[in-house]
Structures are given as structure tokens and as C-alpha cells.
Amino acid sequence: SIHGVAYDADLYTFKAFSSSGAGSDATTGGAFGLIEAIAAIDIVNNSWGTDADCSSASECRTVIGSTTYDNWEDMSQLSTPKISVFAAGNDSESEPTAECQTMAYNTDISAVSVCVVAVSHSSLGTDGGLLADFSNQCGKVAAYCIAAPGDRIYSHTHLGSYTYRSGTSMAAPMVSGGLALIMQEFSSLTPAQVVSRLLTTANDTSEYSQTAKYGHGLMNLNAATTAIAELQTINGSNLLDDPNTSYNDLVKNSFTSSAAFSNALNNALAGQTMEVYDSFDR
């Protein structure tokens, strides 16, 4: 038996392309318009893209289509923005799709968007989790890009069966599922903070330190769903959201006492609750 990355998630599917894979600005933009109006949708996975370059916000808008661009921007500007995940493309190029490149020129979009390249574990690329031969690289959107498994992923088909598929279109939903898990684990995070946590905790060592290829590195959900950096307690009457709030670092503090005092302290603290925060205030 198999299950997805975020198997408790509710899925909404939108048909924006024909059976041959053809789409238009009207169909993709129209889908984004529908998604914008559905409050229950938190993350939008896009396993599609435009094989073209753009070097400004206005040029990107022209390349990907004004309706698609405007509705994507609108989704990113909602009071609770929707996170957009885009496949980087499968053309073995040094730059990703135009949709990914758009993230470099629109701060509202880039705050809640992720571009995804694919790593490989088969003959389609170098074994050992390196960038798949078919995958585009992060290029100029390295700041908004991450790598995830996308080679020979066992998944369902539209015919109701299961098969192996490869491509950044398989890597993107891995990241969408990862973002859903972070949202589930840390429900108080904003969408932008969820994206930041995913990118910050990626494995960026050794091979994955090549930002032009891998952006922030290889997605690491174990790190993303556990404490980041220091564990701290908030001091006395401070407010969590106050920029002047002070904390006590738990790692750098210790407490030694006699057995009698220790027992008394344990009894006094029984049933009490202590809040502990990591470096993301979570």
C-alpha cells in the first residue's frame, strides 16, 4: 500500500488543459480565479509551466499571460495568501520555466511561492540524489527554489491505476505535500512563514550547496517539522509579538539543586504548562 506525503490533505482538482496537454492564458488564469475564491485551498500545486525566459515583471506577465499573472498575483495578495508551487521544467536548462522566473520580479508572489527542481535515483540521471538529467536548474530564482525527488515516483494515473513517472511535475507535489505538513504541524504560521520554514531547513550541504542548481537545497521535512536552532522560553510579562521581547536560551542554562529542593520544585510545577519556542517563535 502507498500514501501521499500529506495523506490527510483534502484535494481540489482543476482541469485547465486538454487531453493533449494544450492550455491557454484563459484556461490557466480562469483556474486561478476559481481557486482564489475558495477559502479552503491553502496550497496550489502547478505541475505545468512555460518554456520561456523573462527578465522583468511586465515581460513575465506577457510571457505567461496577463490573466494567469494577475490572478496569481491576486491569490498572493489575499489576507491569507495561497502558496503556489511550480515545477521548474524538464528541458535540462540552466533557468526554470517562466512561471518560476516570475518569482524573481514580484515580491508579493515570491513571498508565498516555491519553484521545484527534481533529483534522480535512476538511469534518467546521476544516482545518489543528484539533479536529474531532465530537470531545469533553479538559476536566477535560487532564493525561491528547492529540490525534491522527481524520478520514478510511483503514483496514480487518470485511469485509476498506478505507475512510475519522472519529471519536475512529480517533484512539485512532493513539496506541496511538505508545505501541507508544515501547516498542519504549525497552524499559527502565516503562509509566508510556512514557505520560509521549508526553505530555511533544506539540506544545503555538500552537493546541495550549489545554489544555481538546487536553490536552498534538498527538502528536509524532518528538519522542517522539528525545532529550528535555539529552544527558548519567553521571560515573565513579555509579549511574544513584541520586537523587544527577551528570551531565555534553554540549551545554555542548567539547574542544580539538592534532592529535597528538587522534589519540592517538581511538586510545585506539577500540572503547570511551559511554552518553549524555537528560532521561528514556534
Question: Model-found features: residue ranges?
Answer:
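Substrate-binding/access-modulating region of protease and related hydrolase catalytic domains
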Residues: F14-S110, H158-S166, M170-A172
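Sec-exported extracytoplasmic/periplasmic mature domains
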Residues: Y7, E36, G49, S76-T80, ...
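Subtilisin-like serine protease catalytic core
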Residues: S1-T27, A39, S55, S79, ...
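C-terminal subdomain of the subtilisin-like protease fold in secreted/lumenal serine endopeptidases
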Residues: I41-N46, V112-C115, Q184-D281
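Structural recognition of the beta-strand scaffold that forms the well-ordered cores
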Residues: G4, D10-K15, D42-W48, I83-A87, ...
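A short beta-to-alpha transition loop/helix N-cap that caps and shapes the active-site region
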Residues: S20-A22, S123-T126, T205-Y208
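Extracytoplasmic/secreted envelope proteins and their assembly/folding machinery
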Residues: G29-F32, Y69-E73, S113, L131, ...
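Extracellular S/T/G-rich loop segment that most often corresponds to the catalytic His/Ser-adjacent loop
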Residues: T102-Q184, S188
